[in-house]
């Protein structure tokens, strides 16, 4: 029988060195809060209870999680005094089940992997397992003290370590998997009789050893998995490390980056073969790229699906759009939510499309706004065409049927339908439906005054 798993996330720190009114765990890395990373990772496991210990900015933290993770049942526990990590876990005891085991994690250590946590959980055979790492420079970190047989005896904090103990290079990450029964047994016994006058969570290791419990230790695959964030520099460094990992994974999947250090992935990116990504491209949310997609510099793509063989030219913004195969976009195009571009369509420079469908092979090449519209197959939309979809209160639909031709600088005042193969003369204001195959004019007749004299200065 699998032991029930609780997750305790310590998220009470203020993060003074961040110089921010926002709690540290709400700072963002790769477009997601630090705490959000931890929640997403641990809930890839089978978790029975989630307890978050909050402190500074607790209302902000709870509001953020309620908005982003409404589907997760979370127990919130306040740590009103910052008395150390041991005290932070201790305040959860009234909500922590007596049975099962708990992963103890940190809201400012965002990149521990699901695989590492699963291995840590599996290693907890005797009651306590912990994540450790051997580093070149252990200064400031808790040292793992082992006996002659190699068994863990204790964790010694930097300020309490002797000169010999300070030479130890194996350090404590602070991440544990502990039987709940042992937490209920050991945490009430913690003392703050140390240099920091804090209640150290690390003391439960010493207590477990005194009870004859063998402490299991594993190391993460990547050093960055245990790196915490205390200031802006560390946050920026961890951001670049994580982006490097994401880019490397995509390169292994066949993506070519013009410069792997100049791309940001702030979510999940699924890719086909032979994708090219130029410099300065940002992916946000859940994005999918088909085969042979070519994305030029400076584009922002958010929660969108891009079909095979699409070419996205520089500085386009694509937000919650679905793009078919063989589509050309940009430069400087803006696709807003609920835009659908069918196969082989084209959207050119300085075109904005919102909540509209552009049919197969249709073109909107220049300086146009298409909103709340359905555009059929083989339609040509000339430069400067505007669908006037808003009357100040309501949005209305524009329908342009197959093979229609919309002349430049025309305004289509919705609700309006342009029939199959209809032609709209340039400069028209169309306020009524246009029949199939008709030519519609909606402008004043041209007037010419011969020998006109311009005004002159007096």
From Swiss-Prot:
GO cellular component term of the entry, any: cytoplasm
Region (N-acetyltransferase): 254-458
GO molecular function: glucosamine-1-phosphate N-acetyltransferase activity; magnesium ion binding; UDP-N-acetylglucosamine diphosphorylase activity
Comment on bound cofactor: Binds 1 Mg(2+) ion per subunit.
Location of region: Pyrophosphorylase: 1-232
Region of interest: Linker: 233-253
Intracellular or extracellular location(s): Cytoplasm
Keywords: Acyltransferase, Cell shape, Cell wall biogenesis/degradation, Cytoplasm, Magnesium, Metal-binding, Multifunctional enzyme, Nucleotidyltransferase, Peptidoglycan synthesis, Repeat, Transferase
Cofactor: Mg(2+)
Residues binding Mg(2+), per UniProt: 108, 230
Main EC class the enzyme belongs to: transferase
Active site as annotated: 366 (proton acceptor)
PROSITE patterns: HEXAPEP_TRANSFERASES
Pathway of action: Nucleotide-sugar biosynthesis; UDP-N-acetyl-alpha-D-glucosamine biosynthesis; N-acetyl-alpha-D-glucosamine 1-phosphate from alpha-D-glucosamine 6-phosphate (route II): step 2/2; Nucleotide-sugar biosynthesis; UDP-N-acetyl-alpha-D-glucosamine biosynthesis; UDP-N-acetyl-alpha-D-glucosamine from N-acetyl-alpha-D-glucosamine 1-phosphate: step 1/1; Bacterial outer membrane biogenesis; LPS lipid A biosynthesis
Coiled coil feature spans: none
Residues that, per the record, bind UDP-N-acetyl-alpha-D-glucosamine: 10-13, 24, 79, 84-85, 106-108, 142, 157, 172, 230, 336, 354, 369, 380
InterPro entries recorded: Bifunctional_GlmU, GlmU-like, GlmU_C_LbH, Hexapep, Hexapep_transf_CS, MobA-like_NTP_Trfase, Nucleotide-diphossugar_trans, Trimer_LpxA-like_sf
Catalyses which reaction(s): alpha-D-glucosamine 1-phosphate + acetyl-CoA = N-acetyl-alpha-D-glucosamine 1-phosphate + CoA + H(+); N-acetyl-alpha-D-glucosamine 1-phosphate + UTP + H(+) = UDP-N-acetyl-alpha-D-glucosamine + diphosphate
EC number in record: 2.7.7.23, 2.3.1.157
Positions contributing to acetyl-CoA binding: 383, 389-390, 408, 426, 443
A Pfam family this chain is assigned to: Hexapep
Function, as annotated: Catalyzes the last two sequential reactions in the de novo biosynthetic pathway for UDP-N-acetylglucosamine (UDP-GlcNAc). The C-terminal domain catalyzes the transfer of acetyl group from acetyl coenzyme A to glucosamine-1-phosphate (GlcN-1-P) to produce N-acetylglucosamine-1-phosphate (GlcNAc-1-P), which is converted into UDP-GlcNAc by the transfer of uridine 5-monophosphate (from uridine 5-triphosphate), a reaction catalyzed by the N-terminal domain.
Family, per entry: In the N-terminal section; belongs to the N-acetylglucosamine-1-phosphate uridyltransferase family.
Assembly, per entry: Homotrimer.
Protein name according to UniProt: Bifunctional protein GlmU
Organism: Psychrobacter arcticus (strain DSM 17307 / VKM B-2377 / 273-4)
Gene that this sequence comes from: glmU
């Amino acid at each position: 029988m699998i032991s029930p798993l609780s997750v305790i996330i310590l998220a009470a720190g203020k993060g003074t060195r961040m110089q921010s009114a926002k709690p540290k765990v709400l700072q963002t890395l790769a477009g997601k809060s630090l705490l959000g990373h931890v929640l997403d990772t641990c809930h890839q496991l089978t978790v029975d209870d989630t307890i978050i210990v909050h402190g500074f900015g607790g209302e902000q933290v709870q509001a953020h999680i309620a908005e982003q993770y409404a589907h997760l049942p979370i127990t919130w526990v306040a740590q009103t005094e910052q008395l150390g990590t041991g005290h932070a876990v201790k305040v959860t005891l009234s909500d922590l089940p007596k049975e099962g085991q708990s992963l103890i994690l940190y809201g400012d250590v965002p990149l521990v992997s699901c695989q590492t946590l699963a291995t840590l959980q599996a290693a907890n055979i005797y009651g306590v397992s912990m994540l450790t790492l051997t580093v070149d420079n252990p200064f400031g970190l808790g040292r793992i003290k082992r006996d002659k047989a190699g068994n863990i005896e204790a964790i010694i904090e930097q300020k309490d370590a002797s000169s010999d103990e300070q030479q130890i290079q194996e350090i404590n990450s602070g991440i544990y998997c502990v039987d709940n029964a042992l937490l209920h047994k050991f945490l009430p016994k913690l003392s703050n009789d140390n240099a920091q006058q804090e209640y150290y969570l690390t003391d439960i290791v010493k207590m477990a050893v005194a009870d004859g419990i063998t402490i299991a230790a594993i190391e993460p695959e990547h050093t960055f998995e245990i790196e915490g964030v205390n200031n802006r520099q560390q946050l920026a460094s961890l951001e670049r490390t994580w982006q490097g990992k994401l880019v490397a994974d995509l390169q292994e999947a066949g993506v070519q980056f013009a410069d792997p250090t100049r791309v940001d992935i702030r979510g999940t990116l699924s890719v086909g073969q032979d994708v090219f990504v130029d410099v300065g491209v940002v992916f946000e949310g859940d994005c999918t790229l088909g085969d042979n997609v070519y994305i030029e510099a400076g584009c922002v793509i958010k929660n969108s699906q891009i079909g095979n063989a699409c070419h996205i030219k520089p500085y386009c913004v694509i937000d919650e759009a679905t793009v078919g195969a063989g589509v050309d976009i940009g430069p400087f195009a803006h696709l807003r939510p609920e835009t659908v571009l069918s196969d082989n369509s084209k959207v050119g420079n300085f075109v904005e499309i919102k909540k509209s469908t552009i049919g197969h092979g249709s073109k909107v090449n220049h300086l146009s706004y298409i909103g709340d519209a359905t555009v059929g197959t083989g339609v040509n939309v000339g430069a400067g065409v505007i669908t006037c979809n808003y009357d100040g209160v309501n949005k209305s639909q524009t329908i342009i049927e197959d093979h229609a031709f919309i002349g430049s600088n025309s305004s289509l005042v919705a609700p309006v339908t342009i029939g199959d193969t209809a032609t709209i003369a340039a400069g028209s204001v169309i306020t009524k439906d246009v029949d199939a195959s008709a030519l519609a004019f909606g402008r004043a007749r041209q007037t010419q005054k011969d020998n006109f004299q311009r005004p002159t200065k007096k």
